[in-house]
Amino acid sequence: MPLTLTRLDEKTEILIVEMGMTGFGEIDFLCQIAHPTHAIITGIGLVHAEYLGSQQGIARAKTELFRYLPESGAVALREKDRALVTPYLDECKANVIWCSDAADGGAVTSENVVLAAEKSSFDCHMPDATFHVELPFAGRHYVDNALLVTAVARAIDISVSDIQNGLGSAVSLSSSRMEMHPLAEDRLLINDCYNANPDSMIATLDVLAGYKPRPTIACLGNMYELGQYEVEGHAKVGRHLAERGIDWLICLGTLAEIIGEKR
């Protein structure tokens, strides 16, 4: 992130940076460098639980950014994370925008979600607008992320048409995350092995299940950095996999065996 800041010039209007962390105090340090005005917390899963102790610890580390946001700013959060972040909301002076499914009653919601094999779409409802969004990515988790992006984009006065065009033409910047590799004889390889965690693995399995009735094969390995959630995290994936009806399962690693046992 600091290297990115050195490339700014007088023409830069908006800078988007990722603040990654594996421990307490790291986002605090990055905020002192970047001075964010708006923020998104894409989710509070179990990644890095080994270092942060618990999901509540992960929430504490990610919400360190709250105290740096100005009153004129905004932060977009998932409604499903409300219980985890609520203890730290008193530190946030910025406007909090809750995002969710329409049934959950957030300020920015999705409805009529359609998840196709290699794309997704939904209707976005906001206090001042309702519009349709097409995403060039498969998976419900991309819809959730798009809601968060939309909430902050509107907070900085980006137009609805620009939001639609931007989301519709988005590209993945990370390797080994939901990479689609077409193969011979109409086969498709989905590579989502970068620092996998239970939430990301479940999301990928949902995408894979969307290709049925074509034969589906899941090749799953160990998930690391889960700490006390190590066994339950793998078991959770196994239970979900059983519900999705994947045809064949290959497990690589002693932890991944737990997935197979629960299937």
Where are these regions (language model features)?
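P-loop NTPase switch/communication element
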Residues: 1-14
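Alpha-helix C-terminal capping segments
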Residues: 7-8, 32-34, 151-157, 207-212
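Residue-level marker for buried hydrophobic side chains located in beta-strands
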Residues: 15, 75, 189, 218-219
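Switch II (G3) loop of P-loop NTPases
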Residues: 12-27, 189-195
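Acidic, Mg2+-coordinating active-site environments of NTP-dependent enzymes
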Residues: 38-188, 213-214, 239-248, 256-263
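AMP-binding/adenylate-forming
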Residues: 13-18, 30, 35-42
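Active-site beta-alpha connecting loops in nucleotide-dependent enzymes
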Residues: 174-176, 193-263
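Short, glycine/acidic-enriched loop or turn micro-motifs at the edges of active sites
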Residues: 21, 46, 81-82, 194-196, ...
